[in-house]
């Protein structure tokens, strides 16, 4: 199967799930608020929005990711990168639609106010570039993985970091010495500093 056929198959599956009414969305329950190609004319660049896990310093916030897909996908893994920025529009609340162009198009979608965060403080994520260190996105990738299942693995990584493979030394060192109070305080500090409240749609 060619990369484009595989990606079209995945996209159709995502749209089908997002349009299901009266049942919980597996994507939303896994913290995936949005997943789509940047353009339907180019399936090799996608964007995603991930919600932080509950009971962590990441909760009540979401992050955008850029996904660059190689021409030999799914044999080779896509590249996921958290979108980082210092240019945060603090003077207004923006509205995000997560695939929804019309309020009436998706019954059962609820609006929720979350913090749109432009930095990801985490031992396995580069603070200044958004690069991710995760084995299934590198040596342990197999064609059985999909974009949505890989995003689920990234959400799980947020709650279960690997300090021995760090891209953020400061965060990793706090984990290594088991100073969880300082670790969580630093997450909350950066999430507060580099975020703005936005409305998002939650499909359920």
UniProtKB/Swiss-Prot annotation:
One of its GO terms (cellular component) is peroxisomal membrane. It is found in: Peroxisome membrane. GO terms for molecular function: ATP binding; ubiquitin conjugating enzyme activity. Residues 2-196 form the UBC core domain. Keywords: ATP-binding, Membrane, Nucleotide-binding, Peroxisome, Peroxisome biogenesis, Transferase, Ubl conjugation pathway. One of its GO terms (biological process) is peroxisome organization. This is E2 ubiquitin-conjugating enzyme PEX4. The lineage of its organism: Eukaryota, Fungi, Dikarya, Ascomycota, Saccharomycotina. The gene is PEX4.
């Amino acid at each position: 199967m060619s990369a484009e056929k595989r990606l079209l198959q995945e996209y159709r599956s995502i749209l089908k799930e997002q349009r299901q009414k009266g049942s919980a969305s597996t994507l939303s329950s896994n913290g995936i608020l949005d997943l789509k190609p940047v353009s339907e004319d180019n399936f090799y660049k996608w964007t995603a929005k991930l919600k932080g896990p509950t009971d962590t310093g990441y909760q009540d916030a979401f992050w955008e990711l850029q996904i660059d897909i190689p021409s030999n996908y799914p044999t080779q893994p896509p590249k996921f990168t958290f979108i980082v920025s210092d240019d945060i529009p603090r003077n207004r609340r923006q509205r995000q639609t997560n695939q929804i162009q019309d309020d009436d198009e998706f019954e059962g979608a609820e609006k929720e106010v979350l913090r749109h965060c432009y930095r990801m403080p985490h031992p396995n994520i580069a603070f200044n570039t958004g690069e991710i260190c995760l084995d299934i996105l590198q040596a342990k990738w197999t064609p059985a993985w999909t974009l949505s299942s890989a995003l689920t693995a990234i959400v799980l990584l947020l709650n279960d970091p690997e300090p021995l493979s760090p891209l953020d030394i400061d965060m990793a060192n706090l984990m290594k010495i088991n100073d969880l109070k300082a670790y969580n305080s630093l997450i909350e500090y950066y999430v507060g500093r580099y975020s703005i409240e936005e409305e998002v749609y939650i499909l359920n």
